[in-house]
Amino acid sequence: MKKKIAEYEVGEQVDVFLLIKTATKGLASNGKPFLTVILQDPSGDIEAKLWDVSPEVEKQYVAETIVKVAGDILNYKGRIQLRVKQIRVANENEVTDISDFVEKAPVKKEDMVEKITQYIFEMRNPNIQRLTRHLLNKHQNEFLEYPAATKNHHEFVSGLAYHVVSMLDLAKAISNLYPSLDKDLLYAGVILHDLGKVIELSGPISTTYTLEGNLLGHISIMVNEIGKAADELNIDAEEVLILQHIVLSHHGKAEWGSPKPPLVKEAEILHYIDNLDAKMNMMDRALGRTKPGEYTERVFALDNRSFYKPTFHN
């Protein structure tokens, strides 16, 4: 059985089928065009460069194209890359389905639905429960398929739902430790905070930003969705405004994408939970590709740091 791309080490030769996740055009210092491609399989992704590309080649190597690649793995300025020696578009008889090349959440969709439904069932505030259930039902199919982001954390199929389930478990543990927290508000905030990404993002494979995503962003989208849901359900209560604020402020600061900072206790806690789960996912995935006694590649979203894996962590 062939190794997956994340299992290769620096210096090893590669000859595999991979899916182009993204392809971005650039211009080298010599004035010649090149492509930066992100290649993926179910284990993760890796960056590669295609130099001196012609317009015809650019049209060949686009997102959602399966390619046969030969080359070697190298460490370039702390980041793992694939140096391409040969590349071609795969023939139809060589590969089966694009879905065979994408990373997926480690939990079944049915199990995640069951868990999230249980958290909604535990809500005691009828306004919060109805709003949350209504919005989740409206977007459930996409919610269970979409990633949580295009890069950095939970950027895999069903990553959005997996991120939410992990955050709900964190919210429950924190609420048990601090009983003054409104669990209904916190659980609803967790479920709704990134739900706008089903409109912001294009889909589960080769994910990009939609027009709405580029012009509005998932935070503004979800604030509007909560308002529409309240109108549809004839809910005219303060809970609507507080839920909108929780979504609006969950990035914490204006420079991080939130127009308002958290001004409600549950909004502040949601920001911490979101940040913690995202960073844990980044570290776990980077360390999962690292041997004990070695450092990870640099993690851009974590201040470009490399994390050490202790020798006693087998």
UniProtKB/Swiss-Prot annotation:
Family indicated by similarity: Belongs to the YhaM family.
This protein's encoding gene: yhaM
Domain spans labelled HD: 163-279
Record-given protein name: 3'-5' exoribonuclease YhaM
Protein task: Shows a 3'-5' exoribonuclease activity.
SUPFAM superfamilies given in the database record: HD-domain/PDEase-like, Nucleic acid-binding proteins
InterPro entries (alphabetical): 3'-5'_exoribonuclease_YhaM, HD/PDEase_dom, HD_domain, NA-bd_OB-fold, NA-bd_OB_tRNA, YhaM_exoribonuc/phosphodiest
Entry's EC annotation: 3.1.-.-
UniProt enzyme class: hydrolase
Organism per entry: Bacillus cereus (strain G9842)
Membrane-spanning intervals of the chain: none
Pfam families per record: HD, tRNA_anti-codon
GO MF annotation: an example: 3'-5'-RNA exonuclease activity
Gene3D superfamilies: Hypothetical protein af1432 (1.10.3210.10), Nucleic acid-binding proteins (2.40.50.140)
GO biological process: rRNA 3'-end processing
